Curated annotation (Swiss-Prot):
The protein, known as: Catabolic 3-dehydroquinase
UniProt-listed InterPro entries: DHquinase_II, DHquinase_II_CS, DHquinase_II_sf
Reaction it catalyzes: 3-dehydroquinate = 3-dehydroshikimate + H2O
Positions annotated to bind substrate: 75, 81, 88, 102-103, 112
Amino acid sequence: MEKSILLINGPNLNLLGTREPHIYGSTTLSDVEESSKGHAASLGASLQTFQSNHEGAIVDRIHAARGNTDAIIINPGAYTHTSVAIRDALLGVEIPFIELHVSNVHAREPFRHHSYFSDKASGIIVGLGVYGYKVAVEHVALNFKPLEKKAAL
């Protein structure tokens, strides 16, 4: 059975490629999503993508993943440092997740050093640029076990 992966990108990641390219690079989110889908398919997995600048929309998408998703890769953006709601949603659906950041958040402003997700993530990828998405997809596709499907919330 094909492994299903959900890739979630949080606030401002829709601006990848144009926002602070000296930090985030020039690759667009659309490019990242298409490349990630192709890489997942080459590894026998399916990948859905979702991006929102709104915390509640991200929570709703995580809830909708319950019962039909084996793993989540999430770049929570600025919500990394503020969102107990997204953390609780991830824990509530019991889907293993990888936390991902394009930049090295630990080499940036002190307020970016704290994450509400890191202590519960199956893995954390930080500072590899958009290549981190490929690493995350490959790790999930090759190492995560399919979950027993449950009823959606």
